[in-house]
Amino acid sequence: MEQRLKSERLKTELITNVSHDIKTPLTSIVNYVDLLQREHTPEQEREYLAVLDRQAHKLKKLTVDLVEMSKASTGNIPCHIARRSVRELIDQTVGEYAEKLSAARLEPVVTLPDEELYCLCDGALMWRVLDNLLSNACKYACAGTRLYIAARREGETVAFSFKNISRDALNIGPDELMERFVRGDSSRTTEGSGLGLNIAKSLVELQKGTFSIAIDGDLFKVGFALPRTE
């Protein structure tokens, strides 16, 4: 009975949150289209079009995340497991995020063992996992701090960890934070769908891995493990 009530509560919250995330950019689009239909200067037109473009991209990103969440949670995504270099996976992703990390005033600190580590994963899905975790850090980590990224050998697995100081107080448990559309900022003022962690967890599990979140005060940590190979 308790589980069913929780499930119903989550469904209600999901509908409420996705409605909010769709309504906000849609309202903005409608308002700015109305402004464009009135008399305006060329400078105002450029400003209005920039807002429309930004809000349209928000809706597109939300739609893409919703589709990916649905596919990931049902396992309806092709998964091609192969031997991958952990160093290459992390270095490539951090390199591609250099500008965003700089803009968020986050200093990435990567710790890897001297010896080469290899894991069994799907390269494209692993990119999406790392992409979601770095994107999450850029949105919610405290500016002017470090983002600690590490990987190490742990038995028959490679254990990955991402640690950062949260910008907002984390008055929420790890399980609740993992739920769909839940964000670290309860005001929902930060851009993003709130689906990133849920998608990352589903994609890791699709690759026969495990995924967890730990919160200690303002310290936020994501850990996941994938099968190791030589």
Residue ranges and their predicted role:
Residues 40, 74-79, 118-121:
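Conserved micro-motifs of the catalytic ATP-binding
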Residues 51-59:
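Short alpha-helical segment of the dimerization/phosphotransfer core of two-component systems
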Residues 80-84, 107-117:
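Conserved catalytic submotifs in the C-terminal HATPase_c
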Residues 137-138:
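Short helix-loop "hinge" at the ATP-lid/N-box region of the Bergerat-fold HATPase_c
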Residues 144-156:
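Short beta-strand/loop element within the Bergerat-fold HATPase_c
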Residues 169-182:
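Short conserved segment of the HATPase_c
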Residues 208-209:
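Conserved glycine-rich
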